[in-house]
Design a protein with these regions (language model features):
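A membrane-interface helix-boundary motif in multi-pass transporters
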Residues: 54-70, 258-283
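Multi-pass alpha-helical transporter architecture, strongest
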Residues: 71-83, 277-302
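Hydrophobic core of transmembrane alpha-helices in multi-pass small-molecule transporters
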Residues: 1-18, 22, 120, 200-215
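Loop-to-transmembrane helix entry
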Residues: 32-42, 62-65, 138-157, 200-201, ...
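Helix-to-loop junctions at the C-terminal end of transmembrane segments
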Residues: 55-57, 158-172, 260-261
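C-terminal ends and interior cores of transmembrane alpha-helices
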Residues: 181-195
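Helix-loop boundary and gating motifs at the non-cytosolic
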Residues: 111-149, 217, 253
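Juxtamembrane intracellular "pre-TM" segments in multi-pass secondary transporters
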Residues: 82-118
Length: 302
């Protein structure tokens, strides 16, 4: 099972950056149009969470079967996407092109380097949420946690639709900083909330997902597209995804797993307050350093 899961991940994860590149290639104003397209993926996430939660499928193999079928349908649907030939079509292809090394030229820009490093570092504490929130809510006694977590995606829809307005009013740096602060805030809410009088803190922590995801991930993808331009758009998106959703998530999985294990209670369960304070602190440190060093560069037109 595990080798098959790894194989699936190797096939699927690159499509996250690829779909961004294809989308940006067909847009005249990505900062305005991309959120309207990306929000459909959020709706799909909500549907999946509601199905799993409402039908009580969380501890069964049914979600994996549903995912397998949906992946097959998605693969077939991809054949109907608009024709998007490589910008270097008909030109000699070098090893540098195949490996996407042109994206490394963006690192000459100090602000882009700061953005990439900050995004990579923030993705380490992010894994605490993705890997352990469901377990946390289960151990806290919240019923149907998978369904409750879709509240985060519901808030994501609203913030996704409003993202172009926020970008216009606040700019990339402020939006990214708000997104980073939201991650720290949600972990603090999880640390001190409970399923009794302070249950509102848990719900608020979940609802912050709209700010956490849209203001950090989606804004980062739009910023990367602006800095890269059409020629190295795909390479830049792939480079960002590799460092964040690849290396960052991998390190985050090991770090979060080790922290959660170290706070296991012998009688059963975990010391969640101390667990959540770890990623909260990490996010705050990244936020402060990013605020000092990040200076958005002028948009490129190449």
């Amino acid at each position: 099972f595990y080798p098959v899961l790894i194989g699936y991940g190797l096939c699927y994860m690159p499509t996250l950056a690829l779909t961004n590149s294809i989308s940006f290639d067909h847009m005249k104003d990505p900062s305005r149009e991309f959120p309207q397209i990306r929000v459909l993926g959020t709706i799909g996430w909500i549907v999946a969470g509601l199905i799993v939660g409402r039908l009580g499928l969380e501890v069964t193999a049914v979600p994996l079967r549903i995912a397998a079928g949906a992946s097959l349908v998605l693969g077939l649907f991809s054949l109907s996407l608009p024709h998007t030939p490589p910008h270097a079509a008909g030109k000699p292809l070098s090893a540098r092109d195949v490996l996407g090394l042109d994206a490394l030229s963006l690192l000459r820009d100090r602000s882009f380097t700061t953005f990439v490093v900050g995004s990579f570092l923030l993705c380490i504490p992010l894994q605490f949420y993705y890997a352990f929130t469901n377990l946390f809510l289960n151990e806290s006694g919240m019923g149907e946690p998978a369904s409750k977590m879709t509240l985060g995606q519901m808030s994501e829809i609203g913030f996704m639709v409003l993202l172009p307005w926020f970008l216009f009013r606040l700019g990339v740096k402020r939006i990214l900083l708000i997104g980073m602060a939201a991650w720290a805030g949600r972990y603090a809410l999880f640390a001190y909330g409970d399923t009794h009088d302070l249950i509102w803190m848990l719900y608020l922590g979940i609802l912050l997902h709209g700010v956490c995801y849209d203001f950090f991930f989606v804004t980062g993808q739009i910023y990367t597209d602006e800095q890269a331009g059409p020629r190295i758009r795909a390479a830049a998106q792939g480079f960002l995804a590799f460092l964040t959703q690849g290396v960052g998530y991998l390190i985050g999985a090991y770090v979060s797993g080790a922290i959660v294990k170290s706070y296991t209670i012998p009688a059963g369960g975990h010391d969640w307050r101390h667990i959540w304070l770890v990623p909260a602190t990490m996010a705050v440190v990244v936020l402060v350093v990013f605020a000092v060093l990040f200076r958005p560069a002028v948009k490129r037109e190449t």
